[in-house]
Amino acid sequence: RPEALARVTARAAVNAVQADCASPEAIGRVVAGADLVVGALSSSMGFATLRAVIDAGKTCVDISFMAEDAWELDAYAKERGVTAVIDCGVGPGVSNLLVGHGVAQLDVCERIEIYVGGLPALRSWPYEYKAAFAPHDVLEEYTRPARVVEHGEVVLKEALSEPELMDFPEVGTLEAFNTDGLRSLAYTMKAPFMKEKTLRYPGHIALMRALRHTGLFSKEPVTVAGGTVRPID
């Protein structure tokens, strides 16, 4: 929206451009004069945007948490002479860097476990959570199968699966569940067991499972009052 762009330019020394990021051609025009592109669009647009940036021959860093496997573009990026650093946010991102640093200190690494979660300091019913990034992408954590590594093989686990309780000083008890945050670690690390889990206040898993079970996270259109809508929207 023009008014949103105006607020950005008013508080920072940046140039704002309004463009259709669903159009690869538009993305190519926007990044044409850039030395480095940072992608921070929603996950549904991440893969196509990354492809368009590689098409433009631009080095990029992306944090969009796309559902697609970015490794599918590895050969193409090399062909275009592009360096693309994907999933470089907090988790995945900083968590991956910390794992890499830790593993480098060890002679042998048998197991990698990542626990990550951004939580409000004050719990507020019913969700006891505040989205720190795009709400639609938060919901992906409750529906997208999680890739983990068991016995050296990548396997899929259901979202919200294998809950466990963990205690943290000054925070209290939190619950953890499988999420798709290993990303590149599943291919670059040689540990036979690897997983990432997201932390929430207790009770959150049961609530999200109930919403998912009732179909509210479905992407399939349903008819309501003569119109169609996707429940997740």
Residue ranges and their predicted role:
Residues 1-4:
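Helix N-cap at the beta1-alpha1 junction of Rossmann-like dinucleotide-binding domains, i.e.
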Residues 7-14, 77:
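Short, conserved SAM-binding/catalytic segment
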Residues 16, 59-60, 84:
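Hydrophobic beta-strand scaffold residues
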Residues 18-36, 45:
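Conserved Rossmann-fold cofactor-binding substructure of NAD(P)-dependent oxidoreductases
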Residues 31-40, 60-62:
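N-terminal Rossmann-like NAD(P) cofactor-binding module of classical short-chain dehydrogenase/reductase
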Residues 63-87:
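Rossmann-fold NAD(P)-binding glycine/threonine-rich loop
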Residues 81-120:
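Adenosine-phosphate binding glycine-rich loop
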Residues 105-233:
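C-terminal catalytic/substrate-binding lobe primarily of soluble NAD(P)-dependent oxidoreductases
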